[in-house]
Amino acid sequence: MSRRRLLVAALLASAATATACASSPSSVSPGPGGDQASLAKLIVTADLRPCPASSTTVVAGGLPNVTLPCLGNGPAVHMAGLTGEPTVVNIWGSWCPPCQAEMAYLSRAADADRGRVRFLGVDTVDEADSALDFDAHVTPPVHFPSVFDVDRKVLLDAHLPPSPPVTLLVSAAGKVVHTEHGAYTSTAQLQAQIATYLHVSA
């Protein structure tokens, strides 16, 4: 490839990730963060719904074959085994400004579609205490569950850009039917995609 083509490719790659967080900040270290007593209090305050049950099934064209611990209460989740109902999987971090900006829209959509669409967050390269505190202070507060992904396993195994936010819409059969790169700008935008790709209307 010529030098000119390499330059164009680099510019296009840069533009594609303009709405994502370029990397995790050096001040955030992977791991649970804080002591267990403080973490237990934050779990109660955040009041997240339990993480969903999952099977050991691996669906072709589905989520990565990784198992991640629940951020709050509930079982570890085998991501490739999330079947049975349409699911919105949002990859986020409390340290990520675009993630912070869109989370209220996700929270509203999750509340509006509860019982029809499952929402699951994937908190990536974060500290559990920071993530739980963030969820509790979003307006409206986030109550849908998240799993804890300190090593970006979902992003890396799905060959996605290494920086959140990224949202995956997953059919009831477990197949990824849409990938949204960057932050949502309204609840309506997300609900329109849910209607289009998951066939669930608000």
Predicted feature locations:
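Extracytoplasmic
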Residues: 61-63, 82-84, 114, 141, ...
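A short beta-strand-turn-helix
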Residues: 58-60, 65-87
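Short, ordered coil/turn segments that flank beta-strands lining enzyme active or ligand-binding pockets
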Residues: 19, 71-73, 172
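Thiol/disulfide oxidoreductase modules built on the thioredoxin-like
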Residues: 136-143, 148-202
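N-terminal targeting signals for export/organelle localization
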Residues: 1-69, 202
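Hydrophobic alpha-helical membrane segments, chiefly transmembrane helices and signal peptide h-regions
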Residues: 9-20, 87-90, 105-109, 113, ...
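Short active-site neighborhood of thiol/selenol oxidoreductases, capturing the structured segment around
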Residues: 77-100, 106, 119
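Structural microenvironment flanking redox-active thiols in thiol-disulfide oxidoreductases
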Residues: 100-139, 150-157
